[in-house]
UniProtKB/Swiss-Prot annotation:
Disulfide bonds join C21-C71, C30-C54, C46-C67, C89-C139, C98-C122, C114-C135. This is Boophilin-H2. Interacts with host thrombin and trypsin. SUPFAM superfamilies: BPTI-like (SSF57362). It comes from Rhipicephalus microplus. The lineage of its organism: Eukaryota, Metazoa, Ecdysozoa, Arthropoda, Chelicerata.
Length: 142
C-alpha cells in the first residue's frame, strides 16, 4: 500500500513538473526577437524559437541546457545515426527566417571543412550544427 501511494505521489509530481513541456512554443504578446528554447513534443527535442519578451508560457528556456534538464535531453549520438550527407552536409549555410544572432557550424562542400555562420534561430536547413565537433562527426565521417 505504501509503495502504491509513493508511486502515485511521485508520478503526480513528475507530471506537474514536466506538464509545461507539452505546451506549444508561444512567442508572447511583445515584439522583441529573443532567441529561446522550447521542448518540441513532435521531435522530442529542445528547439529554438523567437520570444517576444513578455507573455508566453512556461515552455520557454534561455538555454538549451535548461530546456533539456527540465524536459529531457536527446541522445546526441542517435540524432546522427540516420544522418544523410545530401541533406545534412551539402546544402549551403542558411540563416533561417528569424533575426537571432547565433554562431553555428555548417559543412562547406567546397572547402571540405566545417565553418561558422550566423543562424537566426528558426528555419534554415539540416546543415546547421551547434559545434565544430558535431559538424565534423556527421559530415567528415560519411
Amino acid at each position: 500500500m505504501k509503495c502504491i501511494i509513493l508511486l502515485a505521489v511521485l508520478g503526480t509530481a513528475f507530471a506537474q513538473r514536466n506538464g509545461f513541456c507539452r505546451l506549444p512554443a508561444d512567442e508572447g504578446i511583445c515584439k522583441a526577437l529573443i532567441p529561446r528554447f522550447y521542448f518540441n513534443t513532435e521531435t522530442g527535442k529542445c528547439t529554438m524559437f523567437s520570444y517576444g519578451g513578455c507573455g508566453g508560457n512556461e515552455n520557454n528556456f534561455e538555454t538549451i541546457e535548461e530546456c533539456q534538464k527540465a524536459c529531457g535531453a536527446p541522445e546526441r549520438v542517435n540524432d546522427f545515426e540516420s544522418a544523410d550527407f545530401k541533406t545534412g552536409c551539402e546544402p549551403a549555410a542558411d540563416s533561417g527566417s528569424c533575426a537571432g544572432q547565433l554562431e553555428r557550424w555548417f559543412y562547406n562542400v567546397q572547402s571540405g571543412e566545417c565553418e561558422t555562420f550566423v543562424y537566426g534561430g528558426c528555419g534554415g536547413n539540416d546543415n546547421n550544427y551547434e559545434s565544430e565537433e558535431e559538424c565534423e562527426l556527421v559530415c567528415k565521417n560519411m
